[in-house]
């Protein structure tokens, strides 16, 4: 099947690799423009661009696909490239640009999106993190036929993935990326044989995964310890949960923590104990034990190392 692939981060790169390994013809990739990255803020191509160039695939990087937007010349050039390629399908995974109607209409079989949740739960920008934050027992990937709405298109295929009790967003991301790559390969195989029946998303159970905000990183110790422990996992690695500890001017990043089902024994935010086993923080309900931390400008440290250089 002749495909155009639109995606940007590592999640999308894994799907592109799966499509190429399955033998699909991918003559063109759309991805976000190169961005500054690293300490030197050097312009760096996206993971998808790097994979495409390594495979000898053409790459387009328009800043917008809207013909009436801020970059109409770039959008028109991308449209001309797509029309020359004449794809059967466009596969979209974490691309980062809104697809206008002309884009949805151009491929013979439309545009298919790999979404990292079991729709209609967690439509939107951060489904992996919000599923962990909410305490969901499972999530998954959905292959859907794209329409003009925000993740509202008909579903073609779903794959459920359990969420581990200590699983971080980084770990779940990697698992869902692999599941998404296999799911889109399976969906295209079934689509080619006429074996996929689109299903309308149910009206019940719709939730939205709001984009992550750096302000959310600061742990509010008035909340229950269980909520805070989930946020630590959900925000690992980005934006990274932080907490303020006595004696330190800057917030400390929390990489691992656990909720203890015991009375707080102090006002929210109070340090109840600090030793090699953990730093216990009183919360609005229960105790949050900090297990791995990182000072500003420092390295990640297990708590037994961290407490040697810090005392409340």
From Swiss-Prot:
Keywords: Protein biosynthesis, Transferase. The keyword Protein biosynthesis applies. CDD domains: FMT_core_Met-tRNA-FMT_N (cd08646), Met_tRNA_FMT_C (cd08704). Transmembrane segments: none annotated. Its EC number is 2.1.2.9. One of its GO terms (cellular component) is cytosol. InterPro entries: Fmt, Formyl_trans_C, Formyl_trans_C_sf, Formyl_transf_N, Formyl_transf_N_sf, Formyl_transferase-like_C_sf, GART_AS, Met-tRNA-FMT_C. It catalyses: L-methionyl-tRNA(fMet) + (6R)-10-formyltetrahydrofolate = N-formyl-L-methionyl-tRNA(fMet) + (6S)-5,6,7,8-tetrahydrofolate + H(+). (6S)-5,6,7,8-tetrahydrofolate binds at residues 117-120. The keyword Transferase applies. It comes from the Bacteria. GO terms for molecular function: methionyl-tRNA formyltransferase activity. Pfam families: Formyl_trans_C, Formyl_trans_N. Belongs to the Fmt family. NCBIfam families: fmt. PANTHER family: METHIONYL-TRNA FORMYLTRANSFERASE, METHIONYL-TRNA FORMYLTRANSFERASE, MITOCHONDRIAL. Attaches a formyl group to the free amino group of methionyl-tRNA(fMet). The formyl group appears to play a dual role in the initiator identity of N-formylmethionyl-tRNA by promoting its recognition by IF2 and preventing the misappropriation of this tRNA by the elongation apparatus. This is Methionyl-tRNA formyltransferase. It comes from Bordetella parapertussis (strain 12822 / ATCC BAA-587 / NCTC 13253).
